[in-house]
Structure formats: structure tokens, C-alpha cells
Amino acid sequence: MNKIASFTVNHLTLLPGIYVSRKDKVGEEVITTFDIRMTAPNREPVINTAEIHTMEHLGATFLRNHKDWAEKIIYFGPMGCRTGFYMILAGDLESKDVVGLVTEMFTFMAEFEGDVPGAAARDCGNYLDMNLPLTKIVAKRFLDNTLTNITEEHLVYPD
């Protein structure tokens, strides 16, 4: 079997950032999958399940309610390796096109107060596995260390 594209990225040199993982054509529309990489794979700890689950709920809610981007959001969810998220948008986009959106989303997560959307037994299959206080710390760290003043090396996959 051939390696899928995401397994050809050198995870030993990959930095936290926002990367175009792939582009696919569906009918006449291009959809872009973004790799929102929050930790340096195999060099930093992965995100705990409670925090990544909370971020999934907050991020999906934020994106699907965004005044400018809601109609382009197809999917937002965690990577199985727990080092970040995939975000799929309608359109032929580049990483630089979504820096503002991703920064807004992580600011929303870092500053969120109140009940986590969908954190109820009726709404979620694992609603008890949430941790808002630590989620806010993880989101703020990504904002401060990666998204603020983001550079090209955090927007384009390494060779």
C-alpha cells in the first residue's frame, strides 16, 4: 500500500503551526484540509484527552457560528495522535488565509467562561472527559508561542 500524504511529512522537524495538509476537489468545489499542529510531534507531550476534547467542542462551536466563515466550515476535530486538529474548509485556501480565523478561535478558547457547549450526557458520548481550566492554558500557550507573530516556517511544511 502507498503511504498517505500525511505520513510523508517529516514529523521529526515539524513545528507547531498551521499547514495545508491537502486539497481535494469535490464536484466543482475545492476543499482545503488544514493541519493545526499545536505541539512538536515526538518532541513535546501530546494534548491530554480532556483538553483536546474540550477544545474540539469550543472550536467547532466557534467556527460554525463565525459570521464570516460559518458557511465554509466542513469539519473541525482532533488528530488521533493528539498533537493538534484538522480543519476542513470549502475553498482553495492557503495557511496565511486562515491565520486570523485560527487566532480568533484560540483566543475564544483561551478566554472562554461558562458551560462548555455540548458538555452534557444528551449531547456528547463522553461529556465527563472535559477540562476547561487546562484547555484555556493550552490554548493560550499556542496563541502566545505560535500564532502571535507567526512566521513562514510555521505555515509551510518542512522539506
Identify the residue ranges that each predicted region occupies:
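Low-complexity, highly charged intrinsically disordered N-terminal segments
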Residues: 146-158
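Active/ligand-binding-proximal structured segments within catalytic/core domains
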Residues: 31-65, 75-76
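Generic structural motif
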Residues: 18-20, 73-78
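Active-site-adjacent, His/Asp/Glu-enriched structural segments that form or flank metal-binding
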Residues: 76-149
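Non-catalytic terminal extensions that flank enzyme cores
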Residues: 1-42, 156-159
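Short secondary-structure junctions
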Residues: 66-70
